[in-house]
Amino acid sequence: MATDSGTWAYRDRFGDRFGRTYFRRFPPGVCSSIGLGTYLGEPTDAVDDEYRAAITAALDSGINMIDTAINYRCQRSERVVGDALADSEADREEVVVATKGGFLPFDGSQPADPGRYIREQYVDTDIVDPDTLVRGSHSIEPGVIDHLLDRSLSNLDLDRIDCYYVHNPETQLLDREPAAVYDSLEATFELLERRRAAGDIGCYGLATWEAFRVPPSAEQHLSLATLLDRAARAADAVGVDDHGLQVIQLPFNVEMADAFTQASQPAPPGSDDAGSDSGGGGDRLDGDTDDERVSALEYAHEAGLHVVTSASIGQAALAESIPPAIAAELAGDTTAQQAINFARSAPGVTTSLVGMSSPDHVDENVAAGTFDPLGASAFDAIFE
């Protein structure tokens, strides 16, 4: 497992190679502000080999945040992360490993009949109640997450996962009422609190796509205030003093900056903009005005939540082109480096993930960290 002393030792090994605030606080110690993502690529042995080499190169070069998910590449991404960690010269205590559960995974390759596979492997075996499945493959019920967490530990060949995300919980809102989804999440938070107390995970979070960057009236909106309230209730039920909901993940890049620009969340209690209703009961907060809401990044910062950004270079699209007016404000020798530095410059962001399915990309992406990020005022000025 990652430790405070291990992650700080990793940071110290690189001396002054990187720019200001390249390493940032993240439980239990520090992590790089550029992380390696493992979403892209076909589920093949050849891509496994590329990822293995890329992860090894990243760990050697100054990236100690590795992000994956059980459904990525039919469980192959988790397995290759485990292989690379086992072979790396970096100590396990130096590396923050995060994974996710929510989408039922295939095993090694996509089956000819995905629906039949889900039925035979998960429904017929009583792992998942079909009534809780949304869009045929997504469930956030505690029994399902418990099973997926165990499988992730096995795939990664680890005793502990440093950060475990409930994966795209807003998917449930496509077929279920918000109150029911919040109830399911609270039950799953209780499960994760027990797994945290048992030492199986360090902390937990919510990895999202829509939930925190859309307005409260949107179908897939989730309230951070409500989620934190539900996490506190889950911790109380388990007998834990402080809940373990410490991280959110959301997409953020030059062309998808909603987490900074969209007033999607209720103002935190005690702030000047706070309204009378935090949404603790699971309502969508439709009655709040824009003046009573803040962005997801601002809310997370005020609430003490770490933010990890995904799609930092837009699945490579932004490696080719950034609007000239924005590029002029960003440090970096290449467009990809500028895109990475935009994401990790946003106020409140801890780490920006970049998919690195090939070792050829590692040197360029890591080198983005040798440039200082924008200060808060300079970042704000981009949007003026």
Question: In which residue ranges do the predicted regions lie?
Answer:
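Short, well-ordered coil/turn segments that N-cap beta-strands
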Residues: G29-I34, S61-N64, E89-V95, L158-D162, ...
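Beta/alpha (TIM)-barrel catalytic core signal, keyed to glycine-rich beta->alpha loops juxtaposed to Asp/Glu
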Residues: A2-Y22, D49-E50, I55-A57, R73-C74, ...
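Short, well-ordered amphipathic alpha-helical segments that serve as non-catalytic structural scaffolds
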Residues: A54, I140-L153, T188-L191
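Conserved, mostly hydrophobic/aromatic
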Residues: L36, A58, I66, V81, ...
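N-terminal binding-site loop/beta-alpha segment at the start of enzyme catalytic domains
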Residues: M1-E120, I127, E193-A197, F383
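Active-site mouth loops of central-metabolism enzymes
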Residues: G37-E50, D129-H147, L174-V181, A325-A331
